[in-house]
Amino acid sequence: MAMAMSDSGASRLRRQLESGGFEARLYVKQLSQQSDGDRDLQEHRQRIQALAEETAQNLKRNVYQNYRQFIETAREISYLESEMYQLSHLLTEQKSSLESIPLTLLPAAAAAGAAAASGGEEGGGGAGGRDQLRGQTGFFPSPGGASRDGSGPGEEGKQRTLTTLLEKVEGCRHLLETPGQYLVYNGDLVEYEADHMAQLQRVHGFLMNDCLLVATWLPQRRGMYRYNALYPLDGLAVVNVKDNPPMKDMFKLLMFPESRIFQAENAKIKREWLEVLEETKRALSEKRRREQEEAAAPRGPPQVTPKASNPFEDEDDDEPTVPEIEEEKVDLSMEWIQELPEDLDVCIAQRDFEGAVDLLDKLNHYLEDKPSPPPVKELRARVDERVRQLTEVLVFELSPDRSLRGGPKATRRAVSQLIRLGQCTKACELFLRNRAAAVHTAIRQLRIEGATLLYIHKLCHVFFTSLLETAREFETDFAGTDSGCYSAFVVWARSAMGMFVDAFSKQVFDSKESLSTAAECVRVAKEHCQQLGDIGLDLTFIVHALLVKDIQGALHSYKEIIIEATKHRNSEEMWRRMNLMTPEALGKLKEEMKSCGVSNFEQYTGDDCWVNLSYTVVAFTKQTMGFLEEALKLYFPELHMVLLESLVEIILVAVQHVDYSLRCEQDPEKKAFIRQNASFLYETVLPVVEKRFEEGVGKPAKQLQDLRNASRLIRVNPESTTSVV
């Protein structure tokens, strides 16, 4: 019974949470008011958690059950994407072909257009026939005057056009007597009476290259017409009739002394009639003008070249130039050449870039030593358009917008094909741009968490690994190409290094990390940079050049910190011996001084954990040697003077303080203690600093030597009131 109540409560709770008007705030408020105490709220919370777990399990179960369907759907989407890509290329090619057809060649339509017209009329006539004639590209001749398949409108095609007219129109046999006549356009029309705009009859118009045939419709015989009138285009005028509903889509034909008004099926067909009539009339007028000019041109007698009287001239000079004409012929009738443009379209659509470039190489090899007559030039123009499309696709493959997860090897396919197409420079530019985007993305995706040194390790690993992979892939892809590509790679590497240094400096120097942390981070970066030497690429000098300002700033900043700390200790100086209290503390100090390079520190220690030195001098020694060690890790030649001047400024603060105290102190015991500290500073610390600097830099520092020599003046004349500056 309790179980049943629990199930009903759970189902009721589920329905309540699933309702469209559920409001969490109102629900919690009502629940708090209705609950007796904490126990009811705990039980309700358990029910909600159980419902959440049940929902999660159901969700997992449904996802698992539909997992295979998800995979199939993703595969189908991939197939659909490929097919749409292929269809897009085919449509683009068809659009280019249609746009390349010159309208001026409309009147010179081929016989294939007439055959298409007859087929459209037999299929039902009317608008269907018109659309078929207008839509077929084979209806229009090519620029050379030939049809699409290469054959011109011969006598057989013209006869076939007139035969089609005879089969459909009664009483037009006399058209056979007109040679060179062919069909341009045809369609159904409705004739109206000119005065009262009353419908007269249905007619069919046949526009030919020199005349317009009007035939009336025979209702008893489907698809047949009777000859009505024939109007030469020379004396025919076409006038557009303004729409005046319900009379619309009309145009008028003026033939002196009569006129006729026809109505088209719709505005589109009316516009086609007007355009085709004007174009055909214009073409006929141009044709007859050329004929008149040719007829009027004077024809002089053929020039006969006198026979040369050169006795040394060979008889072969009089031979005809037939061999030269034969040399101009190139056999383009092979099937693979005829189908080459279409095959290239298929390869591009199917992303078979290698196959497309193989076809281009095959064609170039075939035409390598052959002349370039017009057919070859036409073929190359068609192929060049495909090369442009292929190049655009390959460029898109290398664009940064594409996925960058594949690494440098993912670009090898597109790069290699661009190189084969002779576009090595573009391939190099796109490859490096793609890798720059990949490196930038990888750096941005790094999470800044934890210690700075940990982030720098990750940053160096990601960047230098990407740079190394890019360099190796570049060497593989562009081996044997123009050496200018390698110069471009060096420029790119410097740009990428600038991107790395920006991220490096922002995390290390802008965040004001300690000098020891900065030194360790720079050391890690240098170690990774040296790995590039395995492939002959040394970018260490670029790292130095890009980091020099940041390191100078860090050295100046840390120098100011040491100087301020030293001045603060000097202001509280009491010139007392150090008491370390425990042997352990004394032993630790000895180890620290030994690590600083002070090997004779034992002579300054006394009994019972006493040290015969001031706390200020000991602290200064440790801080100065620590600064020098960390600075030497950052050292490179451009930082020589910065580091040296910083050391001199730090040492001068301590030297001037000891000098001033020695001159101002009146107590003999304290004065002796100050002299002991001065001796330690001048004879132990300064030589150690000078020696360590020379070891780290590789050459002695004259400024440090001059500073140590100047300190001797203090010991020679200790009663002087002049301070060393």
Curated annotation (Swiss-Prot):
| Described function | Component of the exocyst complex involved in the docking of exocytic vesicles with fusion sites on the plasma membrane.
State the encoding gene: EXOC8
This chain belongs to which protein, by name? Exocyst complex component 8
Read off the PANTHER family from this record: EXOCYST COMPLEX COMPONENT 8
Q: Where is this region: Disordered?
A: 116-159, 285-322
- Domain (PH): give its ranges: 182-282
Instruction: Kindly indicate whether the keyword Magnesium belongs to this entry.
Output: no
Question: Which Gene3D superfamilies is this protein grouped with?
Answer: Exo84p, C-terminal helical domain, Exo84p, N-terminal helical domain, Pleckstrin-homology domain (PH domain)/Phosphotyrosine-binding domain (PTB)
The record's principal subcellular location, in a coarse class, is cytoplasm
Q: What residue spans carry the Acidic residues bias annotation?
A: 312-322
Q: Name one Pfam family in it.
A: Exo84_C
Cited PROSITE patterns:
PH_DOMAIN
According to its UniProt entry, this protein's organism is Bos taurus
Q: Which family does it belong to?
A: Belongs to the EXO84 family.
Instruction: List, in alphabetical order, the GO biological process terms annotated in this UniProt record.
Output: endosome organization; exocytosis; extracellular matrix disassembly; Golgi to plasma membrane transport; protein localization; protein transport
Q: How does it assemble?
A: The exocyst complex is composed of EXOC1, EXOC2, EXOC3, EXOC4, EXOC5, EXOC6, EXOC7 and EXOC8. Interacts (via PH domain) with GTP-bound RALA and RALB. Interacts with SH3BP1; required for the localization of both SH3BP1 and the exocyst to the leading edge of migrating cells.
Keywords, ordered alphabetically: Cell projection, Cytoplasm, Exocytosis, Phosphoprotein, Protein transport, Transport
Q: Which CDD domains match?
A: PH_RalBD_exo84
Q: Where is the composition biased (Gly residues)?
A: 120-129
The UniProt entry's GO CC annotations, sorted and at most eight, read: exocyst; growth cone; late endosome; perinuclear region of cytoplasm
Query: Where on the chain is Phosphoserine found, per UniProt?
Result: 19
Subcellular location, in the record's words? Cytoplasm; Cytoplasm, Perinuclear region; Cell projection, Growth cone; Cell projection
Q: What's the domain of life for this entry? A: Eukaryota
Q: From the UniProt record, which GO molecular function terms apply?
A: phosphatidylinositol binding; small GTPase binding
The cross-references to SMART domains, in alphabetical order and at most eight, read: PH (SM00233)
